[in-house]
């Protein structure tokens, strides 16, 4: 029942929200937001377990699939679409599904989140299999669309995890691993796009970033698999080579072009003073880890 969910409770500190000054509203929001990172911190051990499972999926050429409705679904898609430019992944490696389809990203689709079968259809459409990991996201922890997706994922042998913002969430029963970040009452009663949404975003940031580090997408703290899809990212790529190797910008730019805009290869070429082909071979043997290639 909704009334039993902490995310649906009224916040005792904001009973007079409509009477507050603009500054008081903003201060109140900021005060509540400061509690979110602390709530996430309590779940780090559970998040770590999820990351390990995702890394295993990636190592087996499986995928990470997020499913959610409303804000939760949008956050999953947001995290997924940032992976290709940041980590050089293809657009199938991390995917996000929202109840009602992509049109629901910008406009609510009535009733979609209440239909378990829609998630099964979405996951069937990509040929979900036992190598994949499905993460169901629901602030309330009870969304039927997410439950349906987790049930189907389990039926095909995929790994499953859930992210919710209430303890003892319903969706936790349908996932092997559970992250339950208890964010409590919102300043605007039931508006889980606020603290709950922020908590979900923080957890998704952790999962995707730590998982990509785990499969060699990062050297030191540099995103060496960045895709140079625009002028800003071309410049960033060259700067990454400078930071990783200590050479001048000109030398970095030269090796960037010699390496056919492959930042990892350019770094290996500079540090080992080798040719492009040899750098690629070393990276292949090292399974993409720059540090191991060196």
Swiss-Prot record:
Keyword vocabulary terms for this entry: Carbohydrate metabolism, Lyase
GO molecular function: carbohydrate derivative binding; carbon-oxygen lyase activity; ether hydrolase activity
Coiled coil regions, renumbered to chain: none
Pfam families: GKRP_SIS_N
Pathway recorded for this protein: Amino-sugar metabolism; N-acetylmuramate degradation
EC number: 4.2.1.126
Gene Ontology biological process terms, A to Z: amino sugar catabolic process; N-acetylmuramic acid catabolic process; peptidoglycan turnover
Catalytic activity: N-acetyl-D-muramate 6-phosphate + H2O = N-acetyl-D-glucosamine 6-phosphate + (R)-lactate
Domain SIS: 54-217
Gene3D superfamilies listed in its UniProt record: 1.10.8.1080, Glucose-6-phosphate isomerase like protein, domain 1 (3.40.50.10490)
Residues forming the catalytic site: 82 (proton donor), 113
Enzyme class: lyase
UniProt similarity note: Belongs to the GCKR-like family. MurNAc-6-P etherase subfamily.
Assembly and binders: Homodimer.
Protein task: Specifically catalyzes the cleavage of the D-lactyl ether substituent of MurNAc 6-phosphate, producing GlcNAc 6-phosphate and D-lactate.
Note: A lyase-type mechanism (elimination/hydration) is suggested for the cleavage of the lactyl ether bond of MurNAc 6-phosphate, with the formation of an alpha,beta-unsaturated aldehyde intermediate with (E)-stereochemistry, followed by the syn addition of water to give product.
Record protein name field: N-acetylmuramic acid 6-phosphate etherase
Gene this chain is encoded by: murQ
């Amino acid at each position: 029942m909704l009334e039993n969910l902490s995310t649906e409770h009224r916040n005792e500190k904001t009973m007079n929200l409509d009477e507050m000054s603009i500054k008081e509203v903003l201060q109140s929001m900021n005060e509540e937001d400061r509690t979110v990172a602390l709530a996430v911190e309590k779940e780090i051990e559970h998040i770590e377990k999820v990351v390990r499972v995702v890394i295993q999926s990636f190592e087996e050429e499986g995928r990470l699939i997020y499913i959610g409705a409303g804000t939760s679904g949008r956050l999953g898609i947001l995290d997924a679409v940032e992976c290709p430019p940041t980590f050089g992944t293809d657009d199938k490696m991390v995917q996000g599904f929202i109840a009602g389809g992509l049109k629901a990203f910008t406009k609510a689709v009535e009733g979609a989140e209440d239909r378990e079968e829609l998630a099964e259809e979405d996951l069937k459409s990509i040929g979900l299999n036992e190598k994949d990991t499905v993460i169901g996201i629901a602030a309330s922890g009870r969304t039927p669309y997410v439950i349906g997706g987790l049930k189907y994922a389990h039926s095909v042998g995929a790994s499953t995890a859930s992210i919710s913002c209430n303890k003892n969430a319903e969706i936790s029963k349908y996932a092997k691993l559970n992250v339950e970040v208890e964010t409590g009452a919102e300043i605007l009663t039931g508006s889980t796009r606020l603290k709950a949404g922020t908590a979900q975003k923080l957890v998704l940031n952790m999962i995707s970033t730590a998982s990509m580090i785990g499969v060699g997408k990062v050297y030191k703290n540099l995103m060496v698999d960045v895709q140079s899809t625009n002028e800003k990212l071309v410049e960033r790529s060259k700067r990454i080579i400078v930071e990783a190797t200590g050479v001048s910008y000109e030398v970095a730019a030269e090796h960037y072009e010699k390496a056919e805009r492959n930042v990892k290869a350019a770094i290996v070429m500079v540090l080992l003073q080798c040719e492009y082909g040899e750098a690629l071979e070393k990276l292949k043997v090292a399974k993409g880890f720059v540090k191991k290639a060196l």
